[in-house]
């Protein structure tokens, strides 16, 4: 298989939606979990980690491919590790929280277990989201139902807690893929100290995690699911380019007029 290279335009676009989404999501989770260390697998430039840092989490590590330009990192260089996410990672340490947000769909299906193994090897608590079928995006080669990932975590003793989606599903500042796909997975050790409201959000054993989304989201998925993958990638690349340029112009505007 030809290796897909993610361009600066891709990461410019990702940064835009990631930062706007990270602030309310982390604003909700941080006081609930109070992590002192966070790992992000598929971190890109580290925008999510920078938002964790702004909440006071000093110990962060982002892991992504060597295609990430380290001159553009949002975190310190020593807080980033270039690695192959299709292989199981052994970082030799544990974190209070590991996360992987909208990454699994970019990896081959055969690497799904490796990703989950890497996350569960690193923490008792994992914040996870990945694109569902029909979501669409650049190089989405592994869109899966949420229950697919649920089964992989269950095989490692991690239970799903659906605490994030009910809180954020109406917050349009958060990109829909984070609003509708984010699940907290926790093993037996990680349950200790969880607040009562998160404990009440545990998905009953034997119950699949339900797909999220409003009518517009479901219609979008229905349409996109019938398009060829290459067409979806091309559409996503054009859209990312337009939105990235728009964001750059908006941020440059005040500076030019000053």
Model-derived features with residue positions:
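Conserved N-terminal segment of class I S-adenosyl-L-methionine
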Residues: 1-99, 110-122, 136, 142-148, ...
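Hydrophobic adenine-recognition pocket in adenosine-nucleotide-binding enzymes
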Residues: 103
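A short His-aromatic
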Residues: 106-107
């Amino acid at each position: 298989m030809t290796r897909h290279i993610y361009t600066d335009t891709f990461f410019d676009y990702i940064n835009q939606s990631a930062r706007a989404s990270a602030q309310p999501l982390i604003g909700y989770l941080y006081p609930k979990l109070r992590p002192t260390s966070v790992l992000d697998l598929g971190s890109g430039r580290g925008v999510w980690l920078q938002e964790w840092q702004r909440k006071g989490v000093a110990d962060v590590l982002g892991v992504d491919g060597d295609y990430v330009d380290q001159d553009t990192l949002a975190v310190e260089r020593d807080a980033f590790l270039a690695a192959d996410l299709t292989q199981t990672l052994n970082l030799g340490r544990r974190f209070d929280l590991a996360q992987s947000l909208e990454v699994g769909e970019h990896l081959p299906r055969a690497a799904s277990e490796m990703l989950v193994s890497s996350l569960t090897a690193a923490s008792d608590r994992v914040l996870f989201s990945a694109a569902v079928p029909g979501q669409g995006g650049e190089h989405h080669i592994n869109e899966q139902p949420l229950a697919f990932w649920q089964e992989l975590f269950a095989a490692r003793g991690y239970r799903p807690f659906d605490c994030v989606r009910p809180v954020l599903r109406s917050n349009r500042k958060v990109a829909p893929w984070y609003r509708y796909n984010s699940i907290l997975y926790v093993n037996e050790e990680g349950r200790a100290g969880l607040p009562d409201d998160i404990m009440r959000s545990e998905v009953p054993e034997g119950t699949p995690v339900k797909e999220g989304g409003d009518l517009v989201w479901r219609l979008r998925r229905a349409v996109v699911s019938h398009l060829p993958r290459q067409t979806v990638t091309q559409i996503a690349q054009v859209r990312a380019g337009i939105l990235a340029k728009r964001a750059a112009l908006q941020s440059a505007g005040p500076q030019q007029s000053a």
